[in-house]
Amino acid sequence: MTQAISDIKAYMQQVGKHARDASRQLAAANTGDKNAALLIIYEQLKQAKDEILAANKIDMDKGRSNNLDAALLDRLALNESRFEAMLQGLKDVAALPDPIGEVTDMTYRPSGIQLGKMRVPLGVVGMIYESRPNVTLEAASLALKSGNAIILRGGSEAYESNQAIAKYILSGLKQAGLPEHGVQVLQTTDRAAVGELITLTEYVDVIVPRGGKGLIARISQDARVPVIKHLDGNCHTFIDSDADPEIAIKVSVNAKTHRYGTCNTMETLLVDQAIANELLPQIAEAIVAADDAMQLRLDAASRTILQDNAKLGGHLSDATDSDWDTEYLAPILAVKIIDGLDAAIDHINTHGSHHTDVIITNNYSKSQRFIREVDSASVMINASSRFADGFEYGLGAEIGISTDKIHARGPVGLNGLTSQKWIVYGHGEVRS
């Protein structure tokens, strides 16, 4: 049950102060203690699997009874495989090199001083997210390993799951001798707590929101604390005239149908007009075969090619202008015939969300132009957009994905939760 808190402002001030105090201790914690805490949490959660999954079932049942959106239900669900992947991510973070204290760019200046840069924690991270109970553990593990304290505010739909996971995070911190307030999962679903968290400039150094476009837009507008974010994931796959047909089909099917409720799912398929007559029907048939619920929203040129295809009956409709700007998070795919590489790049940079975009081609010069000129956090050649993920990038896990250009861009792992400070060694030098 949600804890009733009468004075949200006072509660959040207390949470913030505890986090700031804990952040100073965590910044000085050694790698061994941080890894020990992560592995203790791993073992305890492994033993508590049935308890965690039972808590998630409560959330899922409540979500269904409240008619929660299908994409949110998908994100909310914890099954055996997702639970194991969540735990593996924890072990992967423990195995990563500790970035804190790393010194780079050491150089001597003519004055005699020696200077360089040292990697340090950001301090206190505030995380606001919907569904996805795995984010509770991923964010906590990344914050802990990078020496940050973190305040986690999950959605009300995942309250039982998050609290069950939080219990073992707290236990692991205590057993490892680290501050118990290093990871705090808010014990309220009162939305006023979000408003307080994003304005706690005295205690919080950065906010990371993960959720729907409305949530992130609101936080970006109202926050007084810096925000690391992406608004949505309108990801494209461009099938170039020099594409390998087998790769084009395989990647397109995976990019669209692997999972719908993720920000790295393909939402628009662009096909070069030079190969559209031959290849588009094969791709469309394969995507529809992978999911009979698929709806293809077509521009005029692609409709001309596909409208008489018996295998696609009932799956076709006309695209509107808004389709090119839409993240569906559903079995819906916008399809457009495009006049070559220049038009593809222009379409993506105009309508995309600067998240992840893909070219399928065997032409090296075209691929290099695409990755240089497409203005996205991740740009891929001959691979599914579903790879745009901290785990797949070798980050162990990710606290989020940023489409901003300042501080962090793309999947945000350990280094994204750090900054660098200048360090100077002297021998009594003075400025003349």
From Swiss-Prot:
Annotated family: Belongs to the gamma-glutamyl phosphate reductase family.
Catalyzed reactions: L-glutamate 5-semialdehyde + phosphate + NADP(+) = L-glutamyl 5-phosphate + NADPH + H(+)
Keyword presence, Oxidoreductase: yes
Pathway stated in the Swiss-Prot or TrEMBL entry: Amino-acid biosynthesis; L-proline biosynthesis; L-glutamate 5-semialdehyde from L-glutamate: step 2/2
GO MF, one annotated term: glutamate-5-semialdehyde dehydrogenase activity
High-level lineage: Bacteria, Pseudomonadati, Pseudomonadota, Gammaproteobacteria, Moraxellales
Gene3D superfamilies named in the record: Aldehyde Dehydrogenase, Chain A, domain 1 (3.40.605.10), Aldehyde Dehydrogenase, Chain A, domain 2 (3.40.309.10)
Disulfide bonds: none
Amino-acid biosynthesis keyword on record: yes
EC number(s) recorded for this UniProt protein: 1.2.1.41
GO biological process: L-proline biosynthetic process
Pfam annotation, one family: Aldedh
Task performed by this protein: Catalyzes the NADPH-dependent reduction of L-glutamate 5-phosphate into L-glutamate 5-semialdehyde and phosphate. The product spontaneously undergoes cyclization to form 1-pyrroline-5-carboxylate.
InterPro entries: Ald_DH/histidinol_DH, Ald_DH_C, Ald_DH_N, Aldehyde_DH_dom, Glu-5-SA_DH, GPR_dom
Subcellular location: Cytoplasm
Source organism per UniProt: Psychrobacter sp. (strain PRwf-1)
Name of this chain's protein: Gamma-glutamyl phosphate reductase
